[in-house]
Amino acid sequence: GLPICGETCFTGTCYTPGCTCSYPVCKKN
């Protein structure tokens, strides 16, 4: 629910644990 995980997810995948893709950026749950 929180911004921001420091990566984009244009590929649809977030590599940071605990983060999900909220296109086009990863966000913490």
From Swiss-Prot:
Keywords linked to the UniProt accession: Disulfide bond, Plant defense
Ranges in coiled-coil conformation: none
SUPFAM superfamilies in alphabetical order: Cyclotides
Entries under InterPro entries matching the protein: Cyclotide, Cyclotide_moebius_CS, Cyclotide_sf
GO biological process entries: defense response
Disulfide bonds: 5-19, 9-21, 14-26
Disulfide bond as UniProt keyword: yes
Keyword flag Repeat: no
Crosslink site: Cyclopeptide (Gly-Asn): 1-29
Post-translational modification: Contains 3 disulfide bonds.
Organs and tissues of expression: Expressed in root nodules but not in seed.
Family affiliation: Belongs to the cyclotide family. Moebius subfamily.
Function: Probably participates in a plant defense mechanism.
Domain notes: The presence of a 'disulfide through disulfide knot' structurally defines this protein as a knottin.
Protein name in the entry: Cliotide T18
